[in-house]
A protein has these predicted regions:
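Glycine-rich segments within core transmembrane alpha-helices of 12-TM secondary carriers
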Residues: 120-139
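Helix-to-loop junctions at the C-terminal end of transmembrane segments
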Residues: 47-60, 144, 242-255
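Short amphipathic helix-loop junctions that connect adjacent transmembrane helices
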Residues: 17-33, 211-231
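Helix-loop junctions at membrane interfaces in 12-TM secondary transporters
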Residues: 79-90
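Transmembrane alpha-helix termini and helix-breaking/packing motifs in multi-pass membrane transporters
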Residues: 25-26, 49-57, 134-154, 214-215, ...
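Intracellular juxtamembrane helix-capping segments at the cytosolic ends
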Residues: 19, 100-113
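Structural signature of the two symmetry-related core transmembrane helices
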Residues: 63-76, 257-263
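C-terminal membrane-cytosol helix-exit motif in multi-pass small-molecule transporters
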Residues: 140-144, 159-178
């Protein structure tokens, strides 16, 4: 789980940090193009429910590592497709790897940890992921000019690192048997309607910002790779620093009040 927690942000953080500069500087995207790209990218997320049918034939751990490998390969070859149809196709493939992996990975985490140890263990996994993202951003900022990195070399390094970790996980670690058998069917509860609604609103808000904020910084304000990645790094550091305060706020005022303030 630690390996998978590190591998995903290594590939995805580099992909997302470089994407806007790549599509503007190399492919000459406009606002419509970037909207189409992210629309294509969200299709596998919507279809991630199909993972349930795949699990009838493939173990969750095997599927998770396979999707992680797919994400790594797609990230590695992103710069090989500097045209609209190519970048849309490779984005679709990387999105399949990302969303299907995320779906299965969350399931594995909850299966392999007991209720007592889950909060602590999940927190540690998130910390490993944040550390990997931090390293990826710093590497881009410091190495873009000093190491004469290009879009292709950066994507290749990040993608192949992710792919290598997936292969290592597949070869070295055996298939762990979950203590609780996984239910291979969709479960929807009427009493969870508010959770479903909040997830929908959160996703919509996040996508609107993710799609256009970074793109605008590059297209309208001319930010280069290092400047935009520095913004991402500052945001990450602030999130890490404020996480403790937010945790205390939730503990003091309750989840409902905290969510009400957020939304």
């Amino acid at each position: 789980l630690i390996l998978m927690a590190v591998a995903l942000p290594l590939a995805f953080s580099v992909w997302s940090a470089l994407l806007n500069n790549f599509v503007v500087e190399v492919i000459r995207f406009d606002g419509l193009d970037i909207g189409v790209l992210h629309t294509i990218r969200e299709i596998p997320g919507f279809l991630a429910v199909g993972v349930i049918s795949i699990l009838l034939f493939v173990r969750e751990q095997t599927l998770a590592l396979s999707m992680l490998a797919l994400l790594g390969i797609a990230t590695a070859v992103t710069a090989w497709f500097p045209f609209l149809s190519g970048i849309l196709t490779i984005t679709l493939l990387s999105s399949v790897g990302f969303h299907f992996f995320e779906t299965v990975n969350q399931s594995l985490q909850l299966q392999w940890f007991s209720k007592e140890e889950a909060p602590n263990k999940l927190g540690k996994l998130m910390a490993y992921g944040s550390a990997a993202t931090l390293i990826a951003y710093i590497f881009i900022i410091l190495g873009w000019e000093k190491l004469n990195l290009s879009f292709n070399s950066a994507y290749m390094l990040a993608g192949l690192s992710c792919f290598a970790i997936a292969v290592i996980g597949y070869i070295i670690f055996p298939n762990f048997k979950a203590a609780v058998p996984q239910t291979k069917k969709m479960v929807i509860r009427k009493r969870y309607w508010l959770y479903y609604l909040l997830q929908f609103l959160s996703g919509a808000r996040r996508q609107i910002f993710v799609v256009f904020a970074g793109f605008m910084m590059v297209e309208r304000f001319g930010m280069d790779v290092q400047q935009l990645t520095t913004l991402y790094l500052i945001n990450l550091i602030l999130n890490i620093a404020l996480a403790v305060l937010l945790e205390r706020a939730v503990a003091r005022f309750g989840e409902r009040n905290a969510l009400a303030v957020e939304y």
